Amino acid sequence: MSESLHLTRNGSILEITLDRPKANAIDAKTSFEMGEVFLNFRDDPQLRVAIITGAGEKFFSAGWDLKAAAEGEAPDADFGPGGFAGLTEIFNLDKPVIAAVNGYAFGGGFELALAADFIVCADNASFALPEAKLGIVPDSGGVLRLPKILPPAIVNEMVMTGRRMGAEEALRWGVVNRVVSQAELMDNARELAQQLVNSAPLAIAALKEIYRTTSEMPVEEAYRYIRSGVLKNYPSVLHSEDAIEGPLAFAEKRDPVWKGR
């Protein structure tokens, strides 16, 4: 792996640190490398949760590397598997990802965070999609995912004017899960990761599958879809060893031992 990415495995938790001074900006080469990391995470049966963060205390990521852009890298360049930053276009990832946002998350950096399942941010974090002020658009998920979270008036202001949103406002709107001090950020993200590890992996996979396939459906239609047999993970949960282990462990007053099958 390159000097731009630092990987740490803590049991079944993978920590990914983006380290590209001065702003953890992402060029196509780095994006390719991040895509390989996330795909390897997806396919590694020993890994359950990933945490993505930025080096330092100022920038999570400033998004697309404008220096690379000035040198000829196009906005529609091939950013590799998983799309920009390796995560924004992985639509079949059945394991949870936590974005530990340690500072500014601008442009593609915000889009990377939005592609995660959870956002834990430091109290100095700030979020923005300033692409329109640069003559481009936030098309790595920002203009698609943000409207699912925020009211149209807030989305319009953020994407059309580049308005920044601070950590506390992001918490009020439900953009982030938690706001903690910079010193507590990684410990808090790891605590959340461990809570996810404590849940059954097949159940987590089924939940993610249900979310992504039914979120736009009316409830009645979604019920029919889930029970039609077309999903992969949901039926696997119902007939799994873990579905037996969970109630048994509860009855025996012990922690469950998940097998993922």
Curated annotation (Swiss-Prot):
It catalyses: (R)-carnitinyl-CoA = crotonobetainyl-CoA + H2O. Gene3D superfamilies: 2-enoyl-CoA Hydratase, Chain A, domain 1, Lyase 2-enoyl-coa Hydratase, Chain A, domain 2. Its EC number is 4.2.1.149. The active site is at residues 111, 131. Pfam families: ECH_1 (PF00378). NCBIfam families: PRK03580.1 (NF002936). This is Carnitinyl-CoA dehydratase.
